[in-house]
């Protein structure tokens, strides 16, 4: 039986195994508090995320279960990886992951990025997305603050709690407005992996310019700013709008022509602009795929088709339409955690037999 110790962080009780010491708060999200800690077993610095009251409602239980399943399934150098998970005696859930020193939002607000860093960060974002999308997962909430970076400029995508299945009937409001794809605002139902490419394009533009590309105050203003730069959506995109109110709004807007991005980004590398043009396309069907973008000339210093893996198997979304009581989600979560530790111990044993740590 693991020994648990308690610590107060920002008035919140952290009840963690004695394996983790030196807790320091590093961030607060809508669903949990994140602390840095030292892993006494490995000597490494880690991030410990406490999920607040995961069993308080069926919705929160399902969301936590989804995040746990995704963290277990997604194994890629540019995606945050799970190193431990446990349920405390108070029945809070703790995810332990790698700790990276900063995130892209903090970097972008501190100083302009040089060209080689922009290229390398974009390459890693797209490399991670190629893998995630091949697993049948859409992140849906990609933004600078959930792209983590360490001192070696290694980059990892995190916060998969909102991620959803690639599903032709996806539901509305999710990602932070500045990075939200137009099809989420316009159709509210049918969208897919292309929403992440739009978000990555907005992040790319922000790295080039040093400020958000589409800083909308609300949905209407957001859409207006997008059309100022990219022009009015084509008719075949407008025809996919499901909501009559949204359709009337879009049809009432004055016609605008797409502006050449080179006029907006006067100091940027022409190859960067060409790739950005392929990412920021109104019609998601014509937006560049992650794998295609990796092969773009702008990313040629880093592109290696032999080292841009796809997922070995699709993520199992069979639970996602389930409407279950909290107690059932709790049993399923316990089962996943037991499975995680069994797999982990088997791997550790194998490593020791082969002379590993």
Swiss-Prot record:
GO biological process, one term: stress-activated MAPK cascade
Subcellular compartments: Cytoplasm; Nucleus
Source superkingdom: Eukaryota
Entry's Gene Ontology cellular component terms: cytoplasm; nucleus
Uppermost EC category: transferase
Posttranslational modification: Dually phosphorylated on Thr-171 and Tyr-173, which activates the enzyme.
Keyword Kinase: yes
Keyword Methyltransferase appears in the UniProt entry: no
Residue numbers carrying Phosphothreonine: 171
Binding site for ATP: 26-34, 49
Family: Belongs to the protein kinase superfamily. Ser/Thr protein kinase family. MAP kinase subfamily. HOG1 sub-subfamily.
Domain notes from UniProt: The TXY motif contains the threonine and tyrosine residues whose phosphorylation activates the MAP kinases.
Protein name: Mitogen-activated protein kinase Hog1
Origin organism lineage: Eukaryota, Fungi, Dikarya, Ascomycota, Pezizomycotina
């Amino acid at each position: 039986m693991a020994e648990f110790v308690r610590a107060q962080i920002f008035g919140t009780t952290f009840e963690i195994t004695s394996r983790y010491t030196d807790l320091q708060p590093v961030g607060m999200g809508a669903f949990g508090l994140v602390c840095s800690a030292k892993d006494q077993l490995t000597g490494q610095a880690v991030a410990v995320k406490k999920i607040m009251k995961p069993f308080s409602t069926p919705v929160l239980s399902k969301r936590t279960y989804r995040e746990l399943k995704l963290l277990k399934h997604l194994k890629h150098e540019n995606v945050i990886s799970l190193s431990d998970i446990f349920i405390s005696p108070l029945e809070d859930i703790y995810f332990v992951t790698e700790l990276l020193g900063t995130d892209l939002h903090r970097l972008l607000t501190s100083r302009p990025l040089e060209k080689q860093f922009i290229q390398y960060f974009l390459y890693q974002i797209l490399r991670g997305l190629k893998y995630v999308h091949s697993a049948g997962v859409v992140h849906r909430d990609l933004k600078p603050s959930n792209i983590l970076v360490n001192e070696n400029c290694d980059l990892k995508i995190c916060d998969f709690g909102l991620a959803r299945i690639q599903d032709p009937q996806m539901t509305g409001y999710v990602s932070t407005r500045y990075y939200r794809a137009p099809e989420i605002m316009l159709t509210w139902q049918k969208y897919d992996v292309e929403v992440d490419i739009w978000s990555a394009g907005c992040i790319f533009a922000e790295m080039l310019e040093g400020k958000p590309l589409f800083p909308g105050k609300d949905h209407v203003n957001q859409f207006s700013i997008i059309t100022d730069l990219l022009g009015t959506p084509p008719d075949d995109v407008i025809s996919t709008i499901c909501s009559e109110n949204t359709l009337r709004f879009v049809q009432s807007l004055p016609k605008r022509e797409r502006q050449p991005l080179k006029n907006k980004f006067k100091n940027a590398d022409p190859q960067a602009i060409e790739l950005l043009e392929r990412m920021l396309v109104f019609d998601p069907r014509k937006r560049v795929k992650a794998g295609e973008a990796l092969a773009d000339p702008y990313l040629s210093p880093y592109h290696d088709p032999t080292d841009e893996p796809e997922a070995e198997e699709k993520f199992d979304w069979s639970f996602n339409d389930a409407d279950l009581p909290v107690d059932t989600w709790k049993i399923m979560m316990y089962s996943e955690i037991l499975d995680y530790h069994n797999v982990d111990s088997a791997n550790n044993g194998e490593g020791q037999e082969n002379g590993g740590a």
